[in-house]
């Protein structure tokens, strides 16, 4: 019995030690460093309104349906963050074709003056997460005519807004130019007031 107890004692001590180190000490150190070095990212890259209320995150897309605003990518999960993911249909899957055709039909209703051949792919396909907050500058530009017509904001002003909100590739190498739809719409909202 004493031999069994001598084997169990170090196992229990090591388990408890690693439980405290990995479950308490390490997360606290990492959180502390993140809060000190990159507080905005550590807090979720939140976006606040003029009243200092959280209205979203620059990392998670939102569903904009009002025709006065720029619209983001299609989301198969309706932008519900707790259900992140998409259907990830294969290109040969007929359901993908139906979903894309439905997106194109909705596009044509909202933007009748823009030929379907000019619709960027990111406006009719969803991202892998279904929560993509960004669209391409071209995807924003093809919406200018609709927004200008409804809001009476000159196209030049809207195009300048897109240009100002366009972010380049990460480190100049990774990814493509992109526009955060929430941030773009917040700037547009200032013009609508």
Swiss-Prot record:
Localization terms from the record: Cell membrane
Keyword tags: ATP-binding, Cell membrane, Ion transport, Membrane, Nucleotide-binding, Potassium, Potassium transport, Transmembrane, Transmembrane helix, Transport
Topological type in the membrane: Single-pass membrane protein
One Pfam family here: KdpC
Transmembrane segments: 14-34
UniProt GO cellular component terms: plasma membrane
A single MF term (Gene Ontology): ATP binding
NCBIfam families reported for this sequence: kdpC, PRK00315.1, PRK13997.1
Function: Part of the high-affinity ATP-driven potassium transport (or Kdp) system, which catalyzes the hydrolysis of ATP coupled with the electrogenic transport of potassium into the cytoplasm. This subunit acts as a catalytic chaperone that increases the ATP-binding affinity of the ATP-hydrolyzing subunit KdpB by the formation of a transient KdpB/KdpC/ATP ternary complex.
Subunit structure: The system is composed of three essential subunits: KdpA, KdpB and KdpC.
PANTHER family for this protein: POTASSIUM-TRANSPORTING ATPASE C CHAIN, POTASSIUM-TRANSPORTING ATPASE KDPC SUBUNIT
Family: Belongs to the KdpC family.
Protein name: Potassium-transporting ATPase KdpC subunit
